[in-house]
Amino acid sequence: MKTIVATLLCGVALFAAGPLRRAPGFCLMDTSGQWQDLADYRGKIVLVEFMKTECPHCASFSTVLNGLKVKYGDKLAILAIANPPDNPQTMLQFVKGHNLTYPLLLDQGQAAYSYVRTPSLELPTLYLIDANGMIRNSWVDGVLTKDIFEGNGLSREIDKLLAGAPAKK
């Protein structure tokens, strides 16, 4: 019986992981008025975070992302993306209030939908993209992803990509 349950769980895990897919492209304006095109980051590891400025989990996660940017420097690009009802004013307040060291971009929903592929989005949601532009992993903040959103698990995942770990199947 244990073997059957273990086999089923492994099958569910493999199905949930799914195949690698190319990260959908986007070109969005940041809070300083600069256009940020995902294609410009090819060759780097990229974290794409979908967030909201009034989300307390997103606010606390910004500290983790700032720390990762310091730790990895130019080897890691971080792009945070907010959707309405956020606007340039609320976003600028968030950038200044949390001393963001990475760009915060405004999306009208197109980029978010192309990543998540569902009409609703839990926040924060994070995508890890490899240097070839492939989504290697994604996470939604929650009990099961606590290690990722506290930074330790995320650092391990980034280190694997920097070391040239093979893509998950």
For each feature predicted by the language model, list its residue ranges.
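Sec-dependent N-terminal signal peptides
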Residues: T3-A13
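N-terminal "domain-start" segment that seeds a small globular fold
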Residues: F15-L38
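Alpha/beta-hydrolase fold active-site loops
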Residues: I45-V46, P124
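Hydrophobic beta-strand anchors of alpha/beta hydrolase catalytic cores
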Residues: L47-V48, I78
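Conserved redox-active cysteine motifs that mediate thiol-disulfide chemistry
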Residues: F50-G67
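Thiol-based oxidoreductase modules, predominantly thioredoxin-like and allied folds used
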Residues: K75-P88, Y102-Q110
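Short, internal strand/loop/helix patches
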Residues: L92-T125, I129-A131
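Thiol-/selenol-based redox modules, centered on thioredoxin-like
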Residues: L128-K169
